[in-house]
Amino acid sequence: MIERIWSGKSWLYLLLLPLSWLYGAITWLIRISYTLGLRSAWRAPVPVIIVGNLTAGGNGKTPVVIWLVEQLKQRGYRVGVVSRGYGGKSDVYPLLLSNSTTTSQAGDEPVLIYQRTAAPVAVSPKRSDAVKALLKSHDLDFIITDDGLQHYALQRDFELVVIDGVRRFGNGWWLPAGPMRERAGRLRSVDAVITNGGIAATGEIPMQLAAREAVNLVTGERCPAQQLQHVVAMAGIGHPPRFFATLNLLGIAPKKEYAFADHQDYSLAQLSSLTSGPQNLLMTEKDAVKCRVFAQPNWWYLPVDAQLPPDQAEQLLLKIQALSRCST
């Protein structure tokens, strides 16, 4: 229902407009208070790159963070990542991730980023505390913040916004009548825009999510996803239909598709009930990080990589490298 309202296909958004106006007014006041210096923002001693979005729901932000970390590391830079840790709850903040950190402590996205990139990752509701914790324990050239475009208490040197190229901005209204955290005009003040799927507008960098081989959660075995038989698909991400569409593009027609809420916790009994007999359960990598401890032999996940046009990717990386206060 909420997707229908946000897409502009339902008139019910009209009932939510008063709350949207209130949301918009509050977010504007917060931003202007930092712009005018009425509230102070903390500046890190190294460049901070924000990877965020203007809308709620999955836009492909985490694959961009992973891509950016990997690209900068390949060029010799030391990179750390901070996040609010949404979906996790730690006894102590800031929390520096380790191999034993669980998604219930740090959230699924930070754990995924940590496992994929091996970069130092810290989470805290106050992102500046996470940055300080990273810098205390690591010598870093860049800090990348996963989300946080609207977290103005942390000064930033580069703002990168990720857009869902198919859904774009829906009906254009602020939450809750629409999907917007900030209005589309905010794009005029950011440094780069990456468009995930669909058709990129002028000045935007197009991106596609390319699927890797499917990986077995128990054995680590890899195989082309198309070779899996009797597939049941599940996704607990911001926009599950994107994952199911990816499977369709690969020629996979799941017997069933299960969409779960973003950041949802799972149990063995819950996921085991989704398949029967010879069926294989195929999930996103973000789901997999929450299921490894009780994974079954017929469970697989499908990693995806962000792919950008080489020329535009190089231009983006050169702009970011120019911020570095070190030479490599």
From Swiss-Prot:
EC numbers, comma separated: 2.7.1.130
| Protein's recorded name | Tetraacyldisaccharide 4'-kinase
Annotated Gene Ontology cellular components are: plasma membrane
| Domain of life assignment | Bacteria
Q: Which reaction does it catalyse?
A: a lipid A disaccharide + ATP = a lipid IVA + ADP + H(+)
Pathway info? Glycolipid biosynthesis; lipid IV(A) biosynthesis; lipid IV(A) from (3R)-3-hydroxytetradecanoyl-[acyl-carrier-protein] and UDP-N-acetyl-alpha-D-glucosamine: step 6/6
Q: Please report which protein family the annotation says this sequence is part of.
A: Belongs to the LpxK family.
UniProt KW keywords: ATP-binding, Kinase, Lipid A biosynthesis, Lipid biosynthesis, Lipid metabolism, Nucleotide-binding, Transferase
HAMAP family reported for this sequence = LpxK (MF_00409)
- Record flagged with keyword Repeat: no
A GO BP term, please? lipopolysaccharide core region biosynthetic process
Q: What is the lineage of its organism?
A: Bacteria, Pseudomonadati, Pseudomonadota, Gammaproteobacteria, Enterobacterales
- As given in the record, the signal peptide range reads none
| Entries under Pfam families matching the protein | LpxK (PF02606)
What gene makes this protein?
Answer: lpxK
Q: Where does ATP bind?
A: 55-62
Q: What does this protein do?
A: Transfers the gamma-phosphate of ATP to the 4'-position of a tetraacyldisaccharide 1-phosphate intermediate (termed DS-1-P) to form tetraacyldisaccharide 1,4'-bis-phosphate (lipid IVA).
Give an example GO molecular function: ATP binding
